[in-house]
């Protein structure tokens, strides 16, 4: 939404229209945040529908709109290349833990770190409810995580991890392997613990359940014997 608004502000003679399709199960907090961003902008429409992805495919096929799909469009990687360069400014950075749904962030950071010839590990963290990439990684501790997960964890409190198709899976796995990183699966209790630890040890910082995945992954890695001789970063993302 912000990118479209910036484009339209800078290109008044070539304005773009954006339709945002969201599911009926979206949290009220997320929907209200999107609505606030788009409020009063006649070029942006937010529509709630039972099947947003199918509706987007239909609109693309009929020529009504172009479906901007982060999980398959490699243009989505470009913005994260800049994030990789920012992270590279951290002296002696050794690893990055990334809450992962489609894998776009992990793929982009991994590829850019390789280009920059930086020995920074990529660690992805997924949930007990959605883990198509982590469960495919041969060295992950995911089997233990799944066996000890409570039945309630079939639905994760980290609701942004939803991509069960994982079109980027092979490239993400390649990035993890090339960086000598890892893949982790966190249950709801581990996510809540990560939120509590962060709040208590980072100047009362309150992070979302989705952001807490990164911290939960780091905690699991440390418990499983991982060690580093430099700093480790956890990506704190949006809501």
Region locations from a protein language model:
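Transmitter module of two-component histidine kinases
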Residues: 3-22, 31-46
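Phosphate-binding loop/pocket of nucleotide- and phosphate-handling active sites
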Residues: 141-158, 175, 212-239
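Active-site/ligand-binding loops adjacent to catalytic centers
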Residues: 31-39, 46-64, 115-209
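Short internal beta-strands
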Residues: 18-25, 122-126
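Short glycine/serine/threonine-rich phosphate/pyrophosphate-binding segments
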Residues: 1-3, 28-31, 77-78, 99-109, ...
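Active-site/ligand-binding-proximal alpha/beta "capping" segment
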Residues: 60-116, 192-201
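A short, small-residue-rich loop immediately preceding and capping a beta-strand
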Residues: 1-3, 15-22, 94-105, 231-236
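Alpha-helix C-terminal capping segments
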Residues: 1-13, 111-116, 216-226
């Amino acid at each position: 939404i912000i990118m479209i608004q910036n484009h339209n502000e800078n290109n008044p003679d070539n304005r773009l229209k954006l339709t945002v399709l969201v599911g009926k199960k979206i949290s009220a907090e997320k929907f209200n945040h999107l609505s606030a961003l788009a409020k009063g902008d006649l070029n942006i429409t937010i529509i709630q529908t039972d099947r947003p992805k199918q509706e987007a495919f239909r609109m693309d096929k009929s020529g009504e709109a172009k479906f901007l799909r982060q999980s398959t469009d490699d243009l989505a990687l470009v913005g994260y290349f800049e994030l990789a360069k920012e992270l590279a400014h951290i002296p002696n950075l050794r690893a990055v833990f990334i809450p992962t749904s489609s894998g776009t962030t992990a793929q982009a950071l991994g590829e850019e770190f390789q280009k920059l010839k930086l020995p920074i590990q990529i660690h992805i963290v997924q949930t007990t409810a959605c883990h198509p990439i982590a469960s495919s990684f041969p060295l992950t501790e995911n089997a233990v995580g799944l066996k000890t997960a409570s039945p309630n964890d079939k639905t994760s409190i980290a609701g942004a991890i939803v991509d069960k198709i994982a079109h980027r899976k092979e490239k993400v796995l390649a990035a993890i392997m090339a960086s000598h990183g890892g893949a982790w699966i966190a249950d709801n209790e581990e996510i809540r613990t990560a939120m509590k630890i962060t709040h208590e040890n980072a100047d009362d910082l309150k992070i979302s359940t989705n952001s807490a995945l990164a911290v939960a992954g780091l905690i699991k890695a440390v418990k499983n014997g991982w060690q580093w001789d430099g700093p480790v970063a956890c990506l704190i993302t949006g809501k």
